[in-house]
Amino acid sequence: LRSSGRAEKTAGLDTLVTIFMDTDIAANIAAVKQRIAVAAARCGRDPHSVKLMAVTKTVIPPRIAEALAAGITLLGENYVQEAKGKIAVATAPAEWHLIGHLQTNKAKYAVHLFHCIHSVDRWELAAELDRRAKLANHHLNILIEVNVSGEKTKSGVPGADATALVQRI
């Protein structure tokens, strides 16, 4: 939902906000969809089989409304708390995905807010999401986040443990 990064590194916050707020979201979305169509054609894939997700991290609701009006139907949010407010004021139906790290104690909220959790990285979280989804009679899709780099600062199940986690789930 942001601009293509035209801001200079030395620009102040006010300048960055102005650049991002002046960006034509509909035009950006159209340009991205065109790039998807070209790439899909190059490899013989149906461009309609590609899903475009707009990430709402730090984006204010009026800008999200612009994206929804421009045809975006899939939104990704990093934070459960931020999603609560944004989903409540969304101007059109959309499929919301949690793309950020999820603490087990926030699973109870995530189950009701999101269609999919992209960051499951441990059995305890998967089990709690499953338990909460069953209580809510809600189907919840999950994706396993794998830390393939092995960096301690990155989230995700270590690559060597990923298969065991998937099998257990």
Where are these regions (language model features)?
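Conserved alpha/beta-domain cores
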Residues: 20-169
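N-terminal amphipathic/basic-hydrophobic helices that include classical n-h-c signal peptides
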Residues: 1-20
